[in-house]
Regions:
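Central helical "cap/lid" subdomain
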Residues: 38, 170-216, 226-231, 275
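Flavin-binding catalytic cores
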Residues: 229, 243, 247-287
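C-terminal catalytic lobe of FAD-dependent flavoproteins
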Residues: 270-345
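Helical element adjacent to the flavin cofactor pocket in flavoenzyme catalytic cores
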Residues: 131-167, 171-184, 322-328
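Dinucleotide-binding Rossmann-like beta1-alpha1 core, especially the glycine-rich loop
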Residues: 46-121, 125-127
Length: 345
């Protein structure tokens, strides 16, 4: 008899889990409280497909991102954007030295070239290392349309909040990201040790070919292309893009967005002077859920509680691990739950 499985949350992780379970013949119901799939953190981010360069203080995060890379590229090959120069630079006030950063890259096994971006793109004061890398991004629109196509056969229920009813389901998968603790609490499962951030990502336009610029590893800033959109870019500042943070679930604040965006551009222009001449084009807002830790790790993990062996909680890490998580959950359900606690995918 086919198992009936409820997946809560249709972000990229929930969608991939539902797709993979549906492939093997399970009856899958995918709930999403929004009117469409992938409308929050799956969309409202830097669209970076992590090779690991972003996490010099967490080798595990870098290696897990690489481990999931092949499955991500195979499933979403049409959404990959890679034909642009991408630079990772080290600041003298970084959390890691340039030597430590290079040692990290070599340990993880990610390739790079020593090269600086053109002078008009970067204020080189206090930058002691620049690497040109081949790390790609994804185009959200193509990614979403690919996911929608793959979801055929899944019982997708949009604009539907989880009401706590789990009668008749063999397994329940909580992949609701920023609502993960709310769902766990509804079902009497332990909450994860998370912090929640209200995040703003400014969007700007400039007549320039796509490029990526990231200064590591501290209160600096990063610029990435906005998928395949011509002359559009995303700006993120680790300090000023995070409007508020709490260990309790929070909502997007009512603070003046123009004021917040001004702070981001003002500080980022110290590193990228050309930002003073770009055309601002709005922003993205979302709530981000991150694990509380000391080393900046962003691992994808699964949690199974002794009292709820058929209830799996997903802590979503880097996007490249979405299929890896889906395969692991498929294996758990096929073989039965044999492990309780935390599973690093």
């Amino acid at each position: 008899m086919s198992k009936k499985i409820l997946v809560i949350g249709a972000g990229i992780f929930g969608c991939c889990i539902a797709i993979e379970l549906n492939k093997v013949g399970y009856e899958v119901i995918l709930l999403e409280q929004n009117s469409d799939i992938m409308q929050r953190a799956s969309k409202l981010n830097h669209n970076r497909i992590h090779f690991g360069f972003h996490y010099p203080r967490s080798v595990k995060t870098a290696k897990q991102s690489l481990d999931g890379l092949v499955s991500f590229l195979l499933n979403f090959k049409d959404a990959i954007v890679s034909d642009f120069p991408n630079y990772y630079m080290n600041h003298i006030d970084s959390n890691v030295s340039s030597e430590e950063y290079l040692n990290f890259c070599d340990e993880v096994g990610i390739s790079y070239e020593f090269e600086y971006p053109k002078e008009y793109l970067l204020n080189r004061n206090n930058i002691d290392l620049s690497l040109k890398v081949n790390e790609p991004i994804f185009d959200y629109d193509i990614l979403k349309s690919t996911v929608m196509y793959k979801l055929m056969g899944v019982d997708l229920r949009l604009s539907t909040k989880f009401d706590g009813n789990v009668d008749g389901y063999d397994y329940i998968i909580n992949s609701s990201y920023s609502n993960v603790n709310k769902i766990n609490d509804m079902l009497g499962a332990p909450k994860l040790n998370l912090k929640f951030q209200d995040v703003i990502v400014p969007i700007f336009k400039m007549k320039h070919s796509p490029l990526g610029l990231t200064i590591m590893d501290g209160p600096f800033c990063s610029i990435m292309p906005r998928g395949n959109r011509k002359n559009e870019f995303l700006l993120y500042h680790p300090k000023y893009s995070v409007i508020s943070e709490s260990k309790q679930v929070i909502d997007i604040s009512n603070e003046n967005e123009d004021f917040l965006i001004d702070k981001i551009y003002k500080d980022s222009t110290k590193f990228y002077p050309f930002l003073s001449d770009v055309k601002r084009n709005g922003c993205w807002r979302t709530i981000r859920a991150l694990p509380v830790n000391y080393n900046d790790a962003r691992l994808s993990e699964l949690f199974i509680n002794n009292n709820h062996p058929n209830f799996i909680t997903v802590l979503s890490g880097k996007v490249s691990t979405c299929w890896k998580v889906a395969y692991e959950i498929k294996s758990i359900i096929r073989n039965g739950v044999k492990w309780k606690g935390e599973i690093v995918v």
